[in-house]
Each structure stands twice: as structure tokens, then as C-alpha cells.
Regions:
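Acidic/polar surface patches and capping/hinge elements
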Residues: 138-165
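N-terminal targeting/tethering segments
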Residues: 22-120
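Terminal low-complexity, poorly structured segments
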Residues: 6, 12-14, 110, 115, ...
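Cell-envelope/extracellular anchoring and linker segments
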Residues: 83-86, 94, 98-112, 116-130, ...
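Short, low-structural-confidence N-terminal segments
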Residues: 1-55, 155-204
């Protein structure tokens, strides 16, 4: 059974050490000693967008999540190869739309949503890889529920630090405050719960 747990998992209550990011110029975030540069973030931003602030934080958020998941999987000697992860590409893409779209239709819809929110279509591959890693981690620990994955991830104490210029970092949901359905409304409408929506989804 597939578990879409990342929306809730990365709050982890102690799994992450959050602090002001290294002040070195060009650093957006550091995950377990691995740097995410500002150029890693800006490469996914649409230069024609009116307001890049939300897109910038979204681009960084998912790159952080990828590194956390990669570190967690490696710690369990369960990190799949890029080739093995890619085998789940089409299913991960469809899962972004809760199974309601797939193939070219899903690719086109995702590119449109990203463009409407200041992100290049190439950022879609970041989202898809994040879902692939979510699936791999859930399978690695045989998680049947989101809270099982949260508890297991918390045991690894993966350190994360973030440059505050990217927004207000929420240590409870492991997201930038305000991200979620506001950034990718069409995807959420189709059924996906994004990380920024964790509190509202849990309170219902």
C-alpha cells in the first residue's frame, strides 16, 4: 500500500535540527553537511514571473526534502539507484494528481501549474523525484501509515539549516510558512496534499 507521508512526516518532532543557515554567500540551505546553493534554487525560477519569492521557497523546500530522504535511505542501506527510482517515474507523476491524470496529460498539466506559480517546467522532475524517494522510504521501513514513517525518520536526527532570506521556516511542518495549496492550486485541487498543507489536513 502506497503511503503519501511526506506532507506530515518531515515535521518529525526532533528529527531535524533547524537553525540559521551558514551565512556564506550563495548558500540557500545545508542538509547533513550537503550544501544547496542559491544557484541550485534559481535555476528553476521563471525569470518572467512577477513575484519570485514564493517560487524560490518552493524550489528550495523540495530540494531540502530530497536530500533528507536520500540521507535517510542511505542510513538504512536502502537508497535505490537512479535507474531504479526512475522506474517509478510515471506512477509518481500520476500520484501528484491523485491518479486522475497520467502520461502526457499529467506532464502538460504539471508544467502549466508550475508556470502559473513562477517555476520552470523542469522543476516538475524535482517534484517527481521527491515522490519516488517518499515511496522508497516508506517501502524500506514497511510503513503502512504516515506516522510510522515520521517516527522512523525522527530517529535519524538529520540536521538541516536554512538561509532565512528564503522565508519563515516552520520547524513543525518542515516547510516554509504559507507554502502548499497557495503555490500549486491545481495540483491540490486534484487531490495532492502538499507539505505546506499539513496542519489544515490534520485538523479536519
Amino acid at each position: 500500500m502506497r503511503v503519501r507521508w511526506l506532507a506530515a512526516a518531515l515535521c518529525a518532532l526532533g528529527a531535524l535540527t533547524l537553525a540559521g543557515c551558514d551565512s556564506k554567500i550563495g548558500t540557500a540551505a545545508v542538509v547533513n553537511g550537503s550544501k544547496i546553493s542559491e544557484s541550485d534554487v534559481s535555476r528553476y525560477l521563471d525569470p518572467s514571473a512577477d513575484d519570485a519569492s514564493g517560487a524560490r521557497s518552493t524550489a528550495l523546500q523540495y530540494q531540502i526534502e530530497q536530500k533528507v530522504l536520500t540521507t535517510a535511505l542511505r542510513g538504512k542501506n536502502a537508497l535505490p539507484s537512479d535507474e531504479d527510482l526512475a522506474k517509478g517515474h510515471d506512477q509518481a507523476l500520476s500520484n501528484l494528481f491523485n491518479g486522475q491524470l497520467s502520461g502526457d496529460a499529467a506532464n502538460q498539466a504539471l508544467a502549466k501549474v508550475l508556470g502559473q506559480n513562477g517555476l520552470k517546467a523542469s522543476f516538475g522532475e524535482v517534484l517527481i523525484r521527491t515522490v519516488e524517494l517518499e515511496n522508497a522510504y516508506s517501502e524500506a521501513i514497511n510503513a503502512s501509515q504516515a506516522q510510522d514513517a515520521v517516527a522512523e525518520l525522527a530517529k535519524q536526527h538529520i540536521p538541516v539549516s536554512v538561509n532565512p532570506r528564503y522565508g519563515s521556516w516552520n520547524a513543525q511542518s518542515f516547510t516554509f510558512t504559507g507554502l502548499g495549496s497557495k503555490q500549486l492550486p491545481s495540483v491540490v485541487t486534484l487531490g495532492t496534499t502538499l507539505p505546506g498543507d499539513v496542519k489544515s489536513s490534520n485538523s479536519q
